[in-house]
Amino acid sequence: MLLHGTAGSAADLAQAAFFEALYGAEEPLDLSRYFLVIPDAIGAGDSSKPSDGLHTHFPHYGYKDQVRAQRLLLERVGIKHLKLVLGTTMGGMQTWLWGEMFSNDMDCLVAIASTPAAISGRNMMWREMISQAIRSDPAWKNGDYPKDPPSKNWIKTAIPLSAIMTGSAEQLQKQAPSRETAIDLVDELEASGEAYDANDFLYAFESSADYDPAPGLSR
């Protein structure tokens, strides 16, 4: 089972680059040998989410809820044991939770760009800044805004911050090697933010509040 990152979806793991590097013949996750399950997390892709209509009346969920939902999905399709759980960023953190919550259900865990510890420090500061950017936007209206709000001021802060949070310094330097390209990149990121729903984005980042697998990993 492969788990996507924060504010992403299963579609992120179905891009051509993954087929070339991971899913092709003789590659680590060769599709002719393995059955891959790539679910949309709660609040992402085609899964249920606030923007379906409930707005902030949608139940708040955490990473543990997402892991339980993933396990229920496996039960529904008749999969009793996994060869591998692999995830990146948010998916990596959920991978650690799989190890804590359902340690007998898989042979191997691969948690990428994540650590088995509660979110704190710089990572938590970024998340709080993203949440505050959304909650302080007048157009957010406590989460009860029209489908197409007149403005999305929150994306000017939240989307570039999200890119800094999830991208490496080396990657961002390659994308923006000069002053001009850095400014252009910020503009591009803001433009891409128009595709996001404020409540969906807020819920996704705040869902990490229950994440702390460390105490249970030694069991």
Model-derived features with residue positions:
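Conserved acidic catalytic loop of the alpha/beta-hydrolase fold
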Residues: 64-84, 93-96, 101
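Conserved serine/cysteine hydrolase catalytic core
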Residues: 190-219
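N-terminal cap/lid subdomain of alpha/beta-hydrolase-fold enzymes
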Residues: 1-52
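Alpha/beta-hydrolase-fold enzymes
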Residues: 105, 111-189
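Short alpha-helical segments and helix-capping/turn motifs at coil-helix boundaries
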Residues: 20-24, 93, 147-148
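Short beta-strand immediately N-terminal to the catalytic nucleophile in serine-hydrolase-like folds
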Residues: 85-87, 112
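Catalytic nucleophile-loop/oxyanion-hole region of alpha/beta-hydrolase
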Residues: 53-65
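Conserved alpha/beta-hydrolase "nucleophile elbow" surrounding the catalytic nucleophile
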Residues: 4, 87-89
